[in-house]
Amino acid sequence: TKSAKEGQIKVSYDGYVQVKNVSKTLETLSAQEYILHNWSYAASRGTANQDAVEKYFGLGSKYGNHYADYANVKAHDYTDDVLRTALSHNHSVNVSGGTDKTKVIFTLGYVNDEGIKINSDYNRLNASFKIRQKLAKTLDLDVDFRYTESNLNGRENVTNGKGSNVSGAYRYRPIDNPLGGVSYSEVASGFSFGVANIDDKHNPVELINDITNKSYSRSLRGSAALSWEIIKGFVARSELSLTRSSSKSTYYENGYTNGDKRATLNRGMGDGLRSVSTLNYNFNIGKNNVFSALLGNEVLKSDSESSQITGRGYPSTFDYDTTMGLIHTATTSFSATNSYSVPARTVSFFGRLSYTFMDRYLFTGTFRADGSSKFAPDNRWGYFPAGAFAWRLSEEPFMNGTKDWLSNLKLRLSYGTSGSDNISSNLWRETWSSLGSGSNHTPINGELGSFYRPDGLLANSKLKWETTISRNFGIDFGFLNNRVNGSLEVYWNTTKDLLMAVPVDNTTGYSYQFQNFGKTSNRGIELSVNVDVINKGDFRFNVGAIYNYNRNKLDELPNADQYLYSSYWGSSSLVPTNDYMFVEGKAIGLVRGFISEGYYTVDDFNYTNGQYVLKEGVPDITKALTATYMHPYDLPAGQTAFPGAAKFRDVDESGTVDLDDATCLGEVMPRHTGSFQLNFNYKNFDLSTNFNWTAGGKVYNVAAMINASGQEFDGIGAQRASWVADAFKVYNVNAAGDLYAVTNPDELRALNANAKYHLPYHQSGITSSEWLENGSYLRLQTLTLGYTLPKNWLTKVHVDKIRLYLTATNLFTITGYSGIDPEVNANPTGQSGFYSDLRIFPTLNMDFGTYPRARTFTFGANITF
């Protein structure tokens, strides 16, 4: 926030123009590699599937023998079509001024931001007006008005088992003109569900263009505060702020993809009130005793209401505007619902007492009592004390001999508690939802009335405040007149009674219930250092660095020593279904799966009478892991493993790898993180860089796991990541141009002499150590070059200051991670798709459908008149 200064009127402008594009996309198969993979996979599914692929792409001696011709075809990567180079601009004007009694500041800002995804953009207009009026010598009035409105278009919220329309765009067929010369509709049955990979209507560009997704919001906040200095140092202050907000969102499908126009209209309104009253008394007793006392009260209130209209089946002539205007005319289905939130009320009382002795010993104690209507009456109040002590050791007389090299040395110690009620207001008692007048209800007396059902969460009247206990020991230091300065923090934070949605027995009729779940802790060290390396004349060189070591732990788990849960990205196509786990005493968000041992080689089998028979001592795998795993081999009865199949460790040494061999694969969050900055100044030029890094973390690469599985019929015709070309192969193309199964052991061994990955034909995604990759990285986050024009150039045009700058972000990343970006966190606090505020267990460091990170180039100006 900015406050007006006394004096002449000041006008300043800050603005920039920004160009951004995606920094990296997934490398995919060449056209011929794509053909061979899908031809082979279709053959493994059956002759009907193989014939459809051959007919569509013109393969084999039966359909034109065009396999070799695809070596000269350039693969079309549709990711390049759905992403673009985007232009954004941001402007802010500030006008301030006033007299000794009245100070005013006005700010107007505008942002227009194109998204790197086609048909997406965001714009925001904001204005604020602040005035401070001295009503009397001891009486001040502060008034603040803020208005904001924003529009968001093209939000990417369409996801499925393969990701989003953006992250999954690469899967669409990369060949624009298949050489078979037939329409996809002629072979659709042979592609089964995979027809979407070649269907013109599922072209990623068409999918995005088919959807109009807009949201609009605006808010107005006004506040007024009165401060009265009753006696010297004793100030009473009372502040009241009111907020009013409204929102509208629309979702429209044009029907190009599924032939059925659909629309959803949401409206919402909300009101908020905040009242804060404080008494603050600062006084001294003698020269060496300084006191500060504060007493206060805060009241928070919020209410909201919303409505939703959903329809399906509109005339083909209806466009977006017509459909939204006549949304109630849906012919296939229609529903309308209204909801009113349970009002949220919070009342707090707090106090603080600070005491400083001789400007060397500092004591602070605070206490809060918070009451929230989000909990049942017996649990509404939480009490949170805190205390801190600091010692300016460098000011002690016995440290006088260090003054020439020690500028500052301060020790700090603190202990405190804080509470959180970050949940909805309706979780402690049963609430009901309207089914809407348009739903398929049974009429009563020939009419549809109002129908209600319980909300989707099981009520819990025992909910109480989530509490965090913070413990900290710190050292602030400075050397050589503070040319070297920094701090060292040692911390231990514990959070107990976490408010989380926990799965419950389905026999209750519910899926989840919010509970106070367990206790977690974070222990760590943070070191920050700043060094003025050179500060001479016109040149200055400064270095800053931050290092953090953090270790999290699940200290307590209710009712069990471990708890399994799922990331849900693949639903039933994920093995094991629960791919994350809590283990008491271990880190949070452990990944669970199988230990990969590569793939079964030809040498793991005896080739007897045309059959690949597992050698003694080599464990088999069960179909419970792979589901359908297609291959062309003849196997003994009861055997699942074959050359090229994914191979996992038999942890329990039962002789067969099954679901009992799923184990903890380790933690994913990095323990070591940090950043460092290099800053240069020479005369009017400035150059700064900021690097971020992590070490020791893992990324759960679900995106790669999807590429390594067949996904049954859904996978036919899908493009894959380029590394799939190095996977095990069981088919080859002969001299006549026909595909054949390679069953001879010697030929199979030679064909796969350089294979790096297992045969990607199994139906389910199998979580294994193969998909936990090193997520360490070093990133140049920002690079800025600035120039401040000399003042003698500006005086004639009545300009006080002009600074021009160029900034680039995300210029490069050094990492061994094979995915698009190692800095991922899909669903860090839980799965989406249930309830908007459902805080389920965290699926940390999971790379699935991650929106691509942008690289930006910005030119800006800071001007003061």
Please report, for each region that a protein language model flagged, where it lies by residue.
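Flexible, solvent-exposed loop segments that connect beta-strands
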Residues: 70-71, 258-260
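Extracellular/periplasmic, surface-exposed regions of secreted and cell-surface proteins
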Residues: 60, 86-89, 124, 130-139, ...
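Membrane-proximal, glycine/serine-rich, low-complexity loop/turn segments characteristic
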Residues: 2-219, 225-227, 290-291, 422-441, ...
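Extracytoplasmic gating/loop element in the C-terminal half of outer-membrane beta-barrel translocons
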Residues: 51, 65-66, 79, 372, ...
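Short, glycine-rich nucleotide/cofactor-binding loops
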Residues: 214, 664-669
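Conserved small-residue
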Residues: 12-69, 308-312, 427, 515, ...
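Segments forming glycine/polar-rich beta-alpha architectures that bind adenosine-containing cofactors
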Residues: 652, 668, 686, 690
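Conserved SET/PR-domain catalytic core that frames the SAM/AdoMet-binding pocket
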Residues: 660, 670-684, 781-786, 790
